[in-house]
Design a protein with these regions (language model features):
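C-terminal amphipathic helix plus adjacent low-complexity
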Residues: 150-212
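Aromatic "clamp/platform" in nucleotide-sugar-dependent glycosyltransferases that forms part
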Residues: 71
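Nucleotide-activated donor-binding/catalytic signature segment of Leloir-type glycosyltransferases, i.e.
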Residues: 31-51
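A short, well-ordered alpha-helix in the C-terminal region of glycosyltransferases
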Residues: 131-146, 158
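Short alpha-helical donor nucleotide-sugar binding micro-motif in glycosyltransferases
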Residues: 50-51, 58-63
Length: 212
């Protein structure tokens, strides 16, 4: 998180319109405050604490850019949540990220994991024209739709239904089949709940916004 805070602070020093909104809570809060204080832009760091439901949605829609510096996002859920709000993403190239972020279509994917590279990407996206930003915004929304949890869960449910329609064979096969069906039912219940919810918790995540 300090890595990201340094990058955003670097941009904030040069661009007085840039603010950094942090959603969530964790042990890095004091370090981030120190980074922004030392850079002379402490007044542009905003920490909301943990937000849920409508408050989280409102915060996402108040932003212009989603800055993501984690290399451990295995499923890309956090990224698609941000993209659903029309936010282009600036993120490090990593597993789970590169499957979602498409360079210059819905954000910027940074190959070099350095503060300088991340700072440069943030400067690039904040300097984008209105048309370029609109293109990224629409690309983000399209990606969120493609990765919608409800759609993914529905596809999985279709597979389970197709599996359940088959009949068992031998007695041993029947026992194996009963075990398989028990597993399918458990997974089915989980996926159906996910499909009905259609959302995922974001948790402690950093968001950067450039206010116009």
């Amino acid at each position: 998180l300090a890595f990201l805070a340094h990058a955003v602070a670097n941009v904030a020093v040069e661009k007085p319109e840039v603010h950094f909104l942090v959603i969530g809570a964790g042990p890095s809060e004091q370090e981030m405050e120190q980074i922004f204080t030392q850079a002379g832009v402490a007044d542009r760091l905003h920490m909301t604490g943990v937000l849920q439901q409508q408050a989280l949605i409102d915060a996402l829609h108040a932003m212009d850019i989603f800055a993501f510096a984690s290399c451990s996002e295995t499923q890309g859920i956090v990224l698609t949540e941000a993209m659903a709000a029309g936010l282009p993403v600036v993120a490090l190239d990593a597993s789970g990220v590169r499957e979602v972020v498409q360079h210059e279509r819905n954000g910027l994917l940074i190959q070099e994991h350095t503060t300088a590279a991340f700072t440069g990407a943030l400067k690039q996206i904040t300097a984008a024209t209105a048309q370029q930003r609109e293109t990224l915004k629409q690309g983000a929304k399209a990606t969120a739709e493609e990765h919608a949890m409800s759609r993914s869960a529905a596809k999985a449910l279709q597979c389970f239904r197709a599996l359940a329609e088959h009949q068992p064979g031998t007695p041993k096969g029947e026992r194996d089949w009963e075990d398989a069906l028990a597993w399918v039912k458990a997974e089915w219940d989980i996926l159906r709940s996910m499909a009905e919810a259609g959302t995922a918790a974001v948790g402690s995540t950093l968001f950067a916004t450039s206010e116009e």
